[in-house]
Structure formats: structure tokens, C-alpha cells
Amino acid sequence: MKRVLLLLLLLYSSVTYSQSSTGRKAIREITLTGSGYELGLQHGKLLKKEIAEIVAKWKENTKAQLGKDADLVLKEFFQYAHFDDAIKKWTPDLYEEVKGIAAGSGQAFNDIMVLNLLDEFWVYENKLANHHCSGIGVPAMNGNTAYIAQNMDIESYTDGYQILLRLSKTDKRPEQFILTHPGVIALNGMNETGSGACMNTLMQLKASSTGLPVAFIVRQILNSTDKEELLQFIQTVPHASGQNYIIGIRNEVYDFEASANKVVRFDPKNTNGTIYHTNHPLANDDVKEWFAFNTTSSNSHVRLSAVQQRVKDIPTVDDGIIKDALRSKDDKDNPVCRAPKNGGFTFVSVIMTLSGTPNLQVTAGPPDESEYKKIEFTNAR
């Protein structure tokens, strides 16, 4: 019965995709070299026009959402936010990179920094709305391919600004693919050694105004080529925001729920080794006082169920099954795949192949509106 239900779900997803595909353009790709300030300066100069537009749209959106002048909100936010020390301690090159983006684009430093504090600003707002990412992890078991994948859902005003940064290899870092929009150092990504990271906001978990922000954690993960070093980092660094990290390291996948006071691994113990996550904690109990555990009908729970039923009991989960999960709209009010309306949407959908020859498949926008584009690392060409 479960297999019949799954086949029906897959068929429905395929039909929905074929009917709603709008032929979106493939994601824009940009190659950057160097590191630190130099890297940021390239980013800022190359995308100066787009960064100016994003800054203006951020301010317009913030004013509409909060009902007050965005510059005043920014001032109040940075009175709360004290992330500089953690960034300079754990990822000093990335602090310089943000400075370079600001200089290259001609924007104020705080206007660029707040774009890179996406989750931290959401925490400051303390609202659950519009934080709807859905993620999947598949280990390489029984000769199968390892994947991590995600629909990255953020505000609708970012539509049309999807970019893939290709960071060239240096003596200190592997080549990297980074999904983001202009002005931001990372939303998610992977490196050429088969390590990658996908994230889900966990607004319910306790946060810290002095921890290391999510974007900087992501880039540090992608800089790593050592499994033990990477796992040690994610479990010991002080976290600024409640966040779930699906981390792939070649043949293996891990899931960690991070809060201000603890990091807890989530493992559903599935026979096929799969993991999945949306936007509510499943293992970490370091929650804010307002959070209630009995919200089983929430948007996040509905999406988790949709993803889980597609991958949990399948012996071999391939990229086709993952695509069907990420395109799913079982509940029209709580879809995994979100159209650009009502404040938020699926900004990018990404599938990272970790084992064998690592590569990335990505759509610019909701995956039911375009086909995935496969992108390979330089050493695989």
C-alpha cells in the first residue's frame, strides 16, 4: 500500500511539474578568485548594480514588514547584534570579505553586513513566518550515491537575483559552489571534495547575540576538507541562531540542530540512512519559552511529512526521487515547493551529489517552474 501511495505521489508531482513549468532562465554563474578583502572587492564591483537594488529592496521590505523606517530598524538591530568578535575570531577572512563587498559595491558596511545576517535578523524579528526551507540527506549505502538537497525559501523580493558563485581553488581552500544572491557570502553550498551544507531555520531554539552567524558557519564548513575538523567545528563553535545543518561529507550525511547552548545530532534511524528536516526542532530541547511542542499541524510539520513519506522507506533514493520530493505540493496551503507570493518563495532548489564525481544540480526559483541545471567542478571537466 505504501509503495502504491508513493507511486501516485511521484506521478502527481511529475504531472504538476509538466503543467506549471514556466521555463525560467538558468541560474547566473560567477567565478571569483582570491580570498578575504580581495574576494569581496571582486564580488562588490562585479555585482554593484544588483547589490544596490537588493539593499533598496531589503529596506523597502523591512519597512513594509515592521512598519518603521528601515535605517532606524538597522540601527536598533546592531544595538542588539554583537557578532563582530565571533566573526573575527572564527572566520577573520570572511569579515574582511564582507568589508570588501561593501567597498566594491559602494554600500555602507552595515547595509551589507545585515544581508549576511539573514537568519540573525529573522531571530531579531522573532517571527516564524516565511522560514520554510525543506532539506534531505541520503548516504552512500549499498553502492548508492550520496546526496544532500534543499529548497531554500526566503523573501520574494530576492527573485531574479539568484546566483551561483564558483570560488576558485587556492592553497588554503578547495573549489566551491555557493548559492546566494548579490552581497551575501553564502546561503548554502558544497566543495569539490564532496562536502556540503544545507540549512533550515529553527526559530524555536534559543539564540545568542554574540555567537557566529549562519552564513559564516556555512563558509567555514565549505572551506574544510577534513571530516573530523568539520564535525568538531559544527559541534563546538558558538552558534548565533537556532539552525538545522544537514552536512554531507563524501559518502556520509549528518544532521545537527544547533542552538545557543547546545548542538544535538538528529538521526531518524531509517534503514536506508536518510535524514530530512524542515523548520521545527526534532532533537534539541534548548527552546525559547514561547515555543509549544504540540503544533503538529504547522506548516513545518506538514512539509516534513511530505518529504519523509517520499524517502523514508525507499531502498534506493536517487536524484529523481529527491526532485519529486522538492517539487511536491501535497497540501496547497503548505507546499514543499513555494511559488513567489505571500512574502516568501523557493529561491533555489539544489541537489548536491557528494560521492563519485561531486556535482551540483540547481534551479533558479521553484523547481516546478524549471529543470535542474547540472554544474561540475573544474577537475571533473
Question: For the regions a protein language model found, what residue spans apply to each?
Answer:
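Bacterial Sec-dependent N-terminal signal peptides
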Residues: 1-22
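Basic side chains
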Residues: 2-3, 150, 166, 219, ...
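Short, basic/low-complexity N-terminal boundary segments at the transition from targeting/disordered tails
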Residues: 5, 159, 163-165, 169-171, ...
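A broad, structure-centric signal for solvent-exposed, well-ordered loop/edge residues
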Residues: 7-8, 39, 155, 186, ...
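Enrichment for repetitive, rod-forming helical segments
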Residues: 9-10, 157, 310
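Alpha-helix boundary/interfacial micro-motifs
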Residues: 14, 19, 161-162, 168, ...
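C-terminus-biased signal that marks the final domain/tail of proteins
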Residues: 19-127, 131-132, 141, 221-263, ...
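Internal mixed beta-strand/loop scaffold within catalytic domains of large alpha/beta enzymes
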Residues: 118-216, 232, 347, 359, ...
